[in-house]
Amino acid sequence: MNNYFLRKENFFILFCFVFVSIFFVSNVTIIKCNNVENKIDNVGKKIENVGKKIGDMENKNDNVENKNDNVGNKNDNVKNASSDLYKYKLYGDIDEYAYYFLDIDIGKPSQRISLILDTGSSSLSFPCNGCKDCGIHMEKPYNLNYSKTSSILYCNKSNCPYGLKCVGNKCEYLQSYCEGSQIYGFYFSDIVTLPSYNNKNKISFEKLMGCHMHEESLFLHQQATGVLGFSLTKPNGVPTFVDLLFKHTPSLKPIYSICVSEHGGELIIGGYEPDYFLSNQKEKQKMDKSDNNSSNKGNVSIKLKNNDKNDDEENNSKDVIVSNNVEDIVWQAITRKYYYYIKIYGLDLYGTNIMDKKELDMLVDSGSTFTHIPENIYNQINYYLDILCIHDMTNIYEINKRLKLTNESLNKPLVYFEDFKTALKNIIQNENLCIKIVDGVQCWKSLENLPNLYITLSNNYKMIWKPSSYLYKKESFWCKGLEKQVNNKPILGLTFFKNKQVIFDLQQNQIAFIESKCPSNLTSSRPRTFNEYREKENIFLKVSYINLYCLWLLLALTILLSLILYVRKMFYMDYFPLSDQNKSPIQEST
């Protein structure tokens, strides 16, 4: 009975010991984790303070530079054209990012923000500190308290400017998009600075911007932090970025251009870059001997030939004359006041116009990933591309079926049917494999033998649209970058911008498209900044704190289990002696 009582008592003590040990070890773990987190936060604050000091030093240096520049400008009466341009690197692509973005500085001291370049909208906005419904982006939410020049646009019931609504004593920012998503928050003003990589002068001005307090859909998951709209100001509307930019820099021509490649590109403020024009680069290398005996100052016409070996050449044997003279840019009138709409009058495939309308208003929009066209035009293009899409080169039946096609058997006869058949034969011969991904989008292994499209603009000018542009690189394939229009809104998106210099002349209200070799900028080459978003890393192991806590708990349980086994062994030795020890002295004597 006594032995039983002793065992029960000791097991009760053991239970209490185990409970206290677990509680102690767990609290120690939490305290250590919190200490680590606090240390990392302190380091982050120190880095931010250093960033502020650097920003103040930059401001002082900028003032000195501006004074020196003013003195230099007074002495220099002649400027080079290149010095009048401000160039900004664009990052991103069509496949991974679905947009192109640039970095600008907001506030004093500055905080860098990555912004999607969007010619289809007018707002400049990004998430701010305190937003609970915002996604995780490249930079931390903008902190208004860090900037000496930030000012929230407060209101009292109905005294907001520009017809804005007053919500919660702040003027409401609200933006809706065609795919159904919304972002909203409040307006604030601050200094916007554009650091150019080719010009030491910085464009800087005050701008009313939107602070995101709620994000939805695509904005919630995008990597870039915000959006930079480049469209024009509506009557009585909030002044847009592009209008304020040229208003505060009257020395600049009200022209800007966008030049994007497969990866990255460039935004040019104040004009365009003729050195990027493809025709200029071809002239510098070597001109066709038969067509280019005259000097480069004359009109230059390039005959586009068969596309059997090079995707930069035409898809059929018929020569198509396209003017590529640098000094003879073909401009297209902007047909609407506040957005960049132009008229197109035809869309040719193998010499056949597949447009059933005389003209079509299309929005030139760098914020749209793909080019959106009317359903009937899309179906026509898709029909011919489907014939050229062969996913099984060993299927003799399907191949013979395509080879037996006649011009009369097609949905719409082609003017250059023989070139279409030649391209089909070459695709089969070269085994240019084609697969289909989501929504039946065709993807080819190579650009060879795929057709060029031609868009008819004003004055019957036909602009070439190459496969390297309307297709985009997806891993090792080239996929179609065309979609059916939504809400009856045709759009010339990034798959139209690619490999062209798109020039916006705001003074003359016109746009031009010039084939160009646009610069590439990989996102991996993008400079880092103190305010970029970083997941907190454990200083011991690069694992989450939950995993660290579990590791500590497992270690504690292992130690406790060892103690239990040791104590259990001691109990058995004390209260359950060996059989030889259980014999009494009397029994031994007998």
From Swiss-Prot:
Lineage: superkingdom: Eukaryota
Coiled coil: 33-81
Composition bias type Low complexity, residue spans: 292-304
Lumenal topology ranges: 1-544
Gene3D superfamilies: Acid Proteases (2.40.70.10)
Signal as UniProt keyword: yes
Membrane topology: Single-pass type I membrane protein
Post-translational changes noted in the entry: It is not clear if the zymogen has a cleavable propeptide. In vitro, appears to be cleaved between Asn-80 and Ala-81. Cleavage of the putative propeptide is dispensable for catalytic activity.
Protein name, per record: Plasmepsin V
Disulfide bonds: 128-211, 131-134, 155-166, 160-171, 259-518, 389-434, 443-479
Organism: Plasmodium falciparum (isolate 3D7)
Pfam families documented for this protein: Asp, TAXi_N
